């Protein structure tokens, strides 16, 4: 295989400090970072990545090797260390930032990095923003827009409930702003939970204007709260993985409990209104087979399930097309969430 060395492009070089220890130093020079989405088969790379997963295994012949999942803000990359004990392979763990040198190959149609050298890097050698997927929208601006919707709520108990989370609780605000809405499916990035919740709430606001039978205050409140349980279902970045409660209970149950617990602290909160709000959260996936404990039995619950489905699927399409040139109209392959193959439409 022909390997094209990227040292010239990146200005980044490994050199051995001691031939016996195999300690390697990454020389920091002015360079452009090589993101995972830009990597191509046949290239040699010297780069820093977040090691999201590190697992040891054995080949069929009984030889030990390490399998890694490397991450930056553009995606993930499978990597293998075929000789873990060799010179130039330093000790590191999952969730460490590591400098790697290796060759990009292909396995079963997917890119894979064959790691030749690796070391754990120290703070100051990397910028965390390069390694975590982040919303391309302004997070503070989105949060202010969300608070604007909260300010528009007229029902005093619902407004108090919303404000107790989103206005009066600084720790909650910080968590909600930066949390992901999913592990992989859609909005799986820093700010994803906020972006998705705001978008769903805006869709619901539109629905309320189209259909006067809808209780706007109930619908908007349910939309803002519908995925609040993901704060406990998913761990924070860089892990962004399911917690024990996430596996055992799921975000729908967790979120309903979070809202129910806070409702009990608000004097004279109407019992019927509390039940309707919790029903909307419980039913927001729309169908039992999609994970909802209840099917929508209120028009607001039905509208919320539509809004959630619209935003999840349109974001999935956006993320698919985000990695495809604008003039590319090729079919992108079957997508599980969309239950369809998809391509860009033609331009007039």
Labelled PLM ranges:
Residues 3, 8-10, 19-21:
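Short hydrophobic alpha-helical segments enriched in small aliphatic residues
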Residues 13-14:
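Intrinsically disordered, low-complexity segments enriched in serine/proline and basic residues
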Residues 24-45:
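OB-fold nucleic-acid-binding modules
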Residues 54-64, 77-78, 84-130:
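OB-fold single-stranded nucleic acid-binding module
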Residues 67-72, 236:
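Short, acidic/hydrophobic/Gly-rich beta-strand patch recurrent on exposed beta strands
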Residues 125-247:
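Acidic/His-rich, divalent-metal-binding segments that scaffold phosphate/diphosphate chemistry
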Residues 184-186, 195-196, 206-325:
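Divalent metal-dependent catalytic cores for phosphoryl transfer on phosphate-bearing substrates
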Residues 305, 329-348:
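N-terminal intrinsically disordered, cationic/polar leader segments
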């Amino acid at each position: 295989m022909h390997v094209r060395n990227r040292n010239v492009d990146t200005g980044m070089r490994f050199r051995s400090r001691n031939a016996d220890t195999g300690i390697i130093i990454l020389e920091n020079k002015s360079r452009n970072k090589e993101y995972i989405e830009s990597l191509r088969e046949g290239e040699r790379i010297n780069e820093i990545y977040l090691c999201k997963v590190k697992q040891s295994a054995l080949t069929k012949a009984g030889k030990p090797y390490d399998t890694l999942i490397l991450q930056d803000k553009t995606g993930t990359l499978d990597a293998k260390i075929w000789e873990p004990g060799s010179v130039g392979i330093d000790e590191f763990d999952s969730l460490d930032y590591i400098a790697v040198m290796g060759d990009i190959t292909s396995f079963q149609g997917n890119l894979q990095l064959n790691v030749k050298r690796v070391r754990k890097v120290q703070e100051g050698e990397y910028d965390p923003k390069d390694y975590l997927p982040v919303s391309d929208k302004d997070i503070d601006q989105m949060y202010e827009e969300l608070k604007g919707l909260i300010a528009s709520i007229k029902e005093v108990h619902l407004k108090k409930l919303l404000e107790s989370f989103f206005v009066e609780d600084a720790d909650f605000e910080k968590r909600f702003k930066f949390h992901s809405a999913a592990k992989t499916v859609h909005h799986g990035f820093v700010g994803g939970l906020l972006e998705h919740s705001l978008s769903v709430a805006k869709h619901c606001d539109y629905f309320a204007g189209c259909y006067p039978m809808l209780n706007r205050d109930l619908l908007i409140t349910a939309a803002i709260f519908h995925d609040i349980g993901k704060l406990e279902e998913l761990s924070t970045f860089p892990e962004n993985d399911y917690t024990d409660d996430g596996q055992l209970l799921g975000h729908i149950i967790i979120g309903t409990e979070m809202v129910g617990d806070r409702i009990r602290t608000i004097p004279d909160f109407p019992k019927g209104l509390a039940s309707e709000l919790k029903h909307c959260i419980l039913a927001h996936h729309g169908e039992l087979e999609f994970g909802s404990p209840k099917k929508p039995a209120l028009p607001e619950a039905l509208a919320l399930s539509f809004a959630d489905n619209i935003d999840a699927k349109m974001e999935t399409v956006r993320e698919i097309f985000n990695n495809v040139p604008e003039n590319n109209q090729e079919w992108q392959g079957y997508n599980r969430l969309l239950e369809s193959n998809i391509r860009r439409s033609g331009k007039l």
